[in-house]
C-alpha cells in the first residue's frame, strides 16, 4: 500500500502446529544431527553417561577439557569423573561475591586460553532443534560459546525437555526466556533481558554439525574454523536417580 503500512501475517507459532510425539522428535533430531556428521548418544543412567564420556575422552586422547556452566552441568557435577580420568579441567569461573560480583578480566582470559588449549569442550545447550539437528547455545550458558567453538571436539549435553521441533519454536521460547529456558523473564514477554540481573543475553548460536569449509577446488575440510567432531548426549531423568 502506497503511503501507508501493511500488516504482514504472523508466522505460525509452535503451539498452532501439530504436536510431534516426543520420541519422534528425538528420532528426528538424532537423524538430522547424524546427517550433518554429528554423533548422537543416549544416557539412560549415570553409569551409561560416564561410560559415554569416558569413551569420547579416551578416543580423542584428551588431556585438557573446558567446561561451561549451566544448570544441567551443575546438577551432574562431572568434575570428579573428569579428574578421575586424568583430565585437566578448566571450568567457566563463578561470579564473584560481596561488592564485586563481576567475573574479572584475568579469569576470563584464563578460561579463553584454556579453551583454545583443550581437546574437548563440554557444554550444556538451551535447545536441541529437531528440524535441523542443531544445538542452540546462548550467552546465558556461561562459557558455552568458547568451549563449544575453540576445542576440536565439542560434547553437548541436553535433556528431553530441551528438544524443540522448529526454528519458530526456538525464537518463541527465546523471546520470553529468563536466564535459562525453564526460567521466565521477569521483565516481560518479548524481552531478551536476563532474569538474574546480569544484563541481556547478547547472542544466540546455532551449531549444526561439525565445522566445515571448502576451497575453490571443492575439497571439503572439517574442523578448520571450529570443532571437527560434535557429540550430543541425551541425559535421561534416570541419570539422576
Which functions belong to the PLM regions below?
Residues 1-181, 197-241:
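The feature marks the mature, well-folded catalytic cores of soluble enzymes
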